[in-house]
């Protein structure tokens, strides 16, 4: 029992800074929305539309680079720290190539925006302008993620938290300057949010690099003789590990986007209630997501040390802590769902629907916690391909079709509206949780030599 308590302390010490970093990132998006809304409703809508395109694109790159964390954790655990610098350099090359692709997609996103039904031309122009300003921050964001993954792979999660809050503090005044046109800068409105956010990502990257160069704990790995050129074999391995994670993230983001589109014809009350419940549940999701990042680090480190039993302990402890957290957040959600809904909107119909949907959200919080931590465990074992298959099957084969049938058809019951989609979420996330656990058990029952061989690839 003592080993599980000790492991839980280590996991929480790693996870809490990740939680705070995620809060800072969420707060940046909130600040952008509020400050653009203070300029005009059109600018706020433009930022919202631009963000809905930016997020899937940048999260794809983010997911691809998450492969670095278990690779570095495993090298650190095995004492092969001299190989870490080379992996990081290849990570920067990969980030550079991916950022060019993302920038090309975002530059041409105007075709998607203007194709939207009944969109106001002025709104479309502002959304395109916002994206074309923001896209210059894509390399900065992805380079920052490489540096952050280096630190987190070495079990240093506090730097990411500090840089997140530095970014938030810089974002507010820079937003103000470019939205309203102060200190000789042009008045750009919502487009100014894109300029500010792009600048902030570069500031965060440069601050993180400055920290890494000065950190005594990384003195032995931060330098490499000469300039490392792209190495196809290393980059191919990073892509093999990262692409399934990137696609899984993409499937998750697009699932919720598709559901939002399917709910939109049902009316203002249904859309508002759905959005409130979704926004609150996404805030709760920060907890298991951060714990999953910590579990990846611990499992990768233990496998690097050659201890499959300690890796199992880290995995089981992560799941136990995650279930405890999810139980507490579910009780909190059920107990205060009406009061939470009132913070967003005071329309009685909207509050009633949002409170009902939050009840369904509370039901899936434990499943959601298990599946996201399960994903973190599999990343630690470098078994990322299974994450892709499980996510696709659970979300797009089971969750979305069942939600659509329950919400919009009478094949099973009378059309349930948004609640049907939320039952679909429960089905999808519970299926994902079950499949993640089955895959984890399958991996852990392999002979230790095979597990360690797979982890050292």
From Swiss-Prot:
Cytoplasmic side: 1-10, 74-92, 148-159, 210-242, 297-313, 371-386, 439-457
Major localisation: membrane
Residues on Extracellular side: 32-52, 114-126, 181-188, 264-275, 335-349, 408-417
GO BP: sodium ion transport; xenobiotic transmembrane transport
Membrane topology: Multi-pass membrane protein
Single GO MF annotation: antiporter activity
GO cellular component: plasma membrane
InterPro entries assigned to the protein according to its UniProt record, in alphabetical order: MATE_fam, MATE_MdtK, MdtK-like, Multidrug-R_MdtK
Keywords of this entry: Antiport, Cell inner membrane, Cell membrane, Ion transport, Membrane, Sodium, Sodium transport, Transmembrane, Transmembrane helix, Transport
Residue spans crossing the bilayer: 11-31, 53-73, 93-113, 127-147, 160-180, 189-209, 243-263, 276-296, 314-334, 350-370, 387-407, 418-438
Matches recorded under CDD domains: MATE_NorM_like
Subcellular location: Cell inner membrane
Its job: Multidrug efflux pump that functions probably as a Na(+)/drug antiporter.
Family: Belongs to the multi antimicrobial extrusion (MATE) (TC 2.A.66.1) family. MdtK subfamily.
Protein name: Multidrug resistance protein MdtK
Provenance organism: Shigella flexneri
Lineage of origin: Bacteria, Pseudomonadati, Pseudomonadota, Gammaproteobacteria, Enterobacterales
